[in-house]
């Protein structure tokens, strides 16, 4: 492998990892508050849909490609928050099973977005192509061998994802809000005793996860596919759940795991360049990221400690 190819491999890894970074970071906030969120896949699908529709109509209204793409990102975040409220109301207010509620979000996304896109685009199964984001090249730095192509020529969403990981870590471990959020996920009864509004913070955690997972879905639409269709997300939300668990519910850990899974998808593309790969069925090569997800989850069992009150319903009147 040449140095040029190595730089391109790292670059492609970050492209694939970005959506997983957003969604896994969102999952961390929800589950740190004690609310299991298996609906990341559905939230990403809704975000990808909102970004495709928002970006398309923004371009039709005369906005430039980048401006229209940011409209798509904003639309995805808002849509993600609204959909996450369904999960929050069901699991926090009405005490529904959190696992089932998250799965319902996934099924709802699969059916409703396909219906809505056909309704809005005259029976077509996609939004039509949009310009989306262009990569940003940082002058001079992009010319550095290997590192230039790898780190200094990227989509705006990649830089945003890295920034939010840093902010997410500092918020979780260095601020009063983060301490309160983690306390309601570890021991909600004790948190309630000292005056912390448990359910309010859990709502906030779920809404943050909705916004970030929605942006994760938007990232795929606006950088990789440049349109929305029913298979745009293709299981990235489930990989994000694995990244969250493998990263031990820590923003930095989730980031590292997301990059690992992004690498597994990037290497899938490069494996096909080698002659020996021609003897391997293409289906097996395309299964690689998902096989690694299963292997990582099995390896993480017993090694990752989830928040103590994760998945536990809390009723303030019964404390």
Give the label of every model feature segment.
Residues 150-228, 251-252, 256:
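Helix-loop-helix "hairpin" substructures at the membrane interface of multi-pass membrane proteins
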Residues 1-24, 36, 50, 59-71:
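Membrane-interfacial amphipathic/re-entrant helices at transmembrane-helix boundaries
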Residues 109-174, 275-285, 312-319:
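Transmembrane helix-bundle core of multi-pass membrane transporters
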Residues 213, 223-290:
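Transmembrane alpha-helical segments in multi-pass inner-membrane proteins
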Residues 186-200, 271-319:
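Cytosolic-side transmembrane-helix boundaries in multi-pass membrane proteins
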Residues 63-110, 265:
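Alpha-helical transmembrane segments within multi-pass membrane transporters and channels
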Residues 23-24, 48-52, 110-114, 158-171, ...:
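Hydrophobic core segments of alpha-helical transmembrane domains in multi-pass membrane transport
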Residues 28-50, 92-105, 180, 224-239, ...:
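Short, non-helical or kinked segments that cap or interrupt transmembrane helices
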């Amino acid at each position: 492998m040449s140095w040029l190819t190595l730089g391109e491999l790292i670059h492609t890894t970050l492209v694939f990892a970005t959506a997983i970074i957003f969604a896994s970071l969102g999952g961390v906030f929800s589950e740190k508050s004690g609310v299991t969120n298996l609906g990341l896949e559905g939230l990403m699908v809704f975000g990808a849909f909102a970004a495709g529709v928002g970006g398309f109509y923004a371009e039709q209204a005369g906005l430039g490609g980048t401006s229209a793409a940011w409209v798509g990102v904003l639309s995805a975040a808002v849509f993600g928050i609204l959909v996450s409220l369904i999960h929050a109301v069901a699991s926090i207010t009405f005490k529904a099973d959190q696992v089932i509620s998250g799965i319902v979000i996934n099924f709802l996304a699969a059916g409703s977005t396909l219906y809505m896109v056909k309704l809005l685009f005259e029976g077509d199964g996609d939004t039509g192509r949009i310009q989306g984001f262009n990569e940003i090249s940082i002058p001079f730095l992009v010319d550095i061998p290997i590192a230039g192509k790898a780190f200094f020529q990227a989509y705006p969403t990649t830089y945003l994802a890295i920034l939010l990981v840093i902010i997410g870590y500092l918020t979780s471990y260095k601020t009063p809000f983060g301490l309160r959020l983690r306390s309601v996920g570890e021991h909600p009864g004790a948190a309630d005793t000292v005056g912390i509004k448990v359910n309010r913070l859990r709502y906030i955690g779920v809404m943050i996860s909705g916004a970030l997972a929605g942006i994760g879905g938007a990232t795929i639409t606006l950088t990789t596919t440049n349109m929305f269709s029913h298979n745009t997300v293709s299981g990235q939300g489930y990989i994000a759940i694995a990244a969250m668990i493998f990263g031990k519910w820590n923003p930095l850990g989730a980031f590292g795991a997301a990059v690992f899974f992004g690498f597994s998808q990037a290497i899938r593309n490069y494996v096909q360049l080698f002659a020996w790969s021609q003897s391997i069925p293409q289906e097996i090569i395309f299964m690689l990221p998902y096989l690694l997800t299963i292997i990582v989850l099995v390896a993480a069992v017993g090694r990752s400690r989830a928040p103590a009150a994760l998945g536990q319903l809390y009723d303030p009147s019964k404390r």
